[in-house]
């Protein structure tokens, strides 16, 4: 009997508070719901801002996303020297230094790139055949194909310093040789800065085409369309040479390289409009191997390594270097490359680039 008294008393006491508490809960309920919804909206807004890249720092969406997602260096352009025997007026990688990495250090960097996912390496300059008469380049080409077993090894050259003996020693390890040719008019080549005294740039191009066929190297042509060649019709010449690709670039200005106070070139006189570039492309629309690249496509869609193996970020119209991959590794350095992988794929940056897969009729 006495044990039930406290329980009964407690139940009666609780019953006296049920109605007031219920009233309080019903009045506070909407307030709690409103606060919860407000916090949810605030969190949602922050999430949407992150997805859209609208940060307080005002960073663009690509920069915000790229800082968290690793970039694979599928295709890399290694400008291991800035030295050149030509003086092309629009050149955007000029001879500001004479530095070239020791061979073993260059190989170490290439090994790091391979481990990070590199499939294609393109050697450029400057003029890549100028250093050690092409032997340094040849050893890197052989290393990349034999030891790294890269699917594609290519070179961009003006062609003036290449000898047949180089093909005999290293041709089997090279997939693609791209030769720069901006005009089939020798007077225009002189105006541009590709004149070499008694040497004829066009005749040399034809000789190199023959060597590429003889030594089973895919032949490619690169042309920079500028004020002096924009009216030219190159259709018949290109068809006769029959390259696997004819890369056509719009003349590009880069602060500190070919425009501005610190530049070694003054390329403003070579610049053409987007409309003029489109007219040139339309004139050559029947050339099946034509691959055009406007300034917009070109600026952010290349992974460029300089002579110190630093990635060069060209997003702001100049070349801002990262730290060297030899010092900080590929993953850290590539975050500062400014590389736009979507544009790389959109411009056709990934194609059949191994001569084993090209199935050419040598």
UniProtKB/Swiss-Prot annotation:
Lineage start: Eukaryota, Metazoa, Chordata, Craniata, Vertebrata
Pfam families associated with the record: Fer4_12, Radical_SAM
PTM (free text): Acetylated by HAT1. HAT1-mediated acetylation of Lys-198 in turn recruits UBE4A that stimulates RSAD2 polyubiquitination leading to proteasomal degradation. 'Lys-6'-linked polyubiquitination at Lys-207 leads to RSAD2 protein degradation.
Region (Disordered): 49-71
Positions bound to [4Fe-4S] cluster: 84, 88, 91
Domain of life of the native organism: Eukaryota
Topology relative to the membrane: Peripheral membrane protein
Gene, per the UniProt record: RSAD2
Regulation: IRAK1 and TRAF6 synergistically activate RSAD2 increasing its activity with CTP as substrate about 10-fold.
Function, as annotated: Interferon-inducible antiviral protein which plays a major role in the cell antiviral state induced by type I and type II interferon. Catalyzes the conversion of cytidine triphosphate (CTP) to 3'-deoxy-3',4'-didehydro-CTP (ddhCTP) via a SAM-dependent radical mechanism. In turn, ddhCTP acts as a chain terminator for the RNA-dependent RNA polymerases from multiple viruses and directly inhibits viral replication. Therefore, inhibits a wide range of DNA and RNA viruses.
Cofactor needs: [4Fe-4S] cluster
Record location of the Glycyl lysine isopeptide (Lys-Gly) (interchain with G-Cter in ubiquitin) cross-link: 207
Induction info: By interferon type I, type II and LPS.
Domains (record comment): The N-terminal region (1-42) is necessary for its localization to the endoplasmic reticulum membrane and lipid droplet.
Subunit annotation: Homodimer. Interacts with IRAK1 and TRAF6. Interacts with FPPS. Interacts with HADHB. Interacts (via C-terminus) with VAPA/VAP33 (via C-terminus).
Organism: Sus scrofa (Pig)
Cofactor note: Binds 1 [4Fe-4S] cluster. The cluster is coordinated with 3 cysteines and an exchangeable S-adenosyl-L-methionine.
Ranges of biased composition (kind: Basic and acidic residues): 56-68
Stored InterPro entries: Aldolase_TIM, Elp3/MiaA/NifB-like_rSAM, RSAD2, RSAD2/Viperin_antiviral, rSAM
NCBIfam families named among the record's database cross-references: viperin (TIGR04278), viperin_w_prok (NF038283)
Example GO BP: response to virus
Compartments, record wording: Endoplasmic reticulum membrane; Golgi apparatus; Endoplasmic reticulum; Lipid droplet
Known catalytic reactions: CTP + AH2 + S-adenosyl-L-methionine = 3'-deoxy-3',4'-didehydro-CTP + 5'-deoxyadenosine + L-methionine + A + H2O + H(+)
Protein name (Swiss-Prot/TrEMBL): S-adenosylmethionine-dependent nucleotide dehydratase RSAD2
EC number of this enzyme: 4.2.-.-
Keywords recorded for this protein, A-Z: 4Fe-4S, Acetylation, Antiviral defense, Endoplasmic reticulum, Golgi apparatus, Immunity, Innate immunity, Iron, Iron-sulfur, Isopeptide bond, Lipid droplet, Lyase, Membrane, Metal-binding, Mitochondrion, Mitochondrion inner membrane, Mitochondrion outer membrane, S-adenosyl-L-methionine, Ubl conjugation
């Amino acid at each position: 009997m006495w044990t039930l008294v406290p329980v009964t008393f407690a139940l009666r006491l609780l019953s006296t508070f049920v109605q007031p508490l219920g009233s309080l809960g019903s009045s506070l309920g909407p307030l709690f719901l409103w606060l919860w919804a407000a916090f949810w909206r605030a969190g949602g807004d922050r999430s949407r801002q992150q997805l859209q890249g609208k940060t307080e720092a005002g960073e663009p969406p690509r920069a915000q996303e790229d800082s968290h997602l690793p970039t694979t260096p599928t295709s890399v352009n290694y400008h291991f020297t800035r030295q050149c025997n030509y003086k092309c007026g629009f050149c955007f990688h000029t001879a500001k230094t004479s530095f070239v990495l020791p061979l073993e250090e260059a190989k170490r960097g290439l090994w790091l790139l391979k481990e990070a996912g590199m499939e294609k390496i393109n050697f450029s300059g400057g003029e890549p055949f100028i250093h050690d008469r092409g032997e340094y380049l040849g050893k890197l080409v052989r290393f990349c194909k034999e030891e790294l077993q890269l699917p594609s090894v290519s070179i961009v050259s003006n062609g003036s310093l290449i000898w047949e003996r180089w093909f005999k020693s290293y041709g089997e390890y090279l997939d693609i040789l791209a030769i720069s040719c901006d005009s089939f008019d020798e007077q225009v080549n002189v105006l541009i800065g590709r004149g070499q005294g008694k040497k004829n740039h066009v005749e040399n191009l034809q000789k190199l085409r023959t060597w590429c066929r003889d030594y089973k190297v895919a032949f490619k042509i690169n042309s920079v369309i500028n004020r002096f060649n924009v009216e030219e019709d190159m259709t018949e010449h290109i068809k006769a040479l029959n390259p696997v690709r004819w890369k056509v670039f719009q003349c590009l200005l880069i602060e500190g390289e070919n425009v501005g106070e610190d530049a070694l070139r003054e390329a403003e006189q070579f610049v053409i409009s987007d409309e003029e570039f489109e007219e040139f492309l339309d004139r050559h629309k029947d050339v099946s191997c034509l691959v055009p690249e406007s300034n917009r496509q070109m600026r952010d869609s290349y992974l460029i390594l300089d002579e110190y193996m630093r990635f060069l970020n060209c997003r702001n119209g100049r070349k801002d270097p990262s730290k060297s991959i030899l010092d900080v590794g590929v993953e850290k350095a590539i975050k500062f490359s400014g590389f736009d992988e979507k544009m790389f794929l959109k411009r056709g940056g990934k194609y059949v680039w191994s001569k084993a897969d090209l199935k050419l009729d040598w």
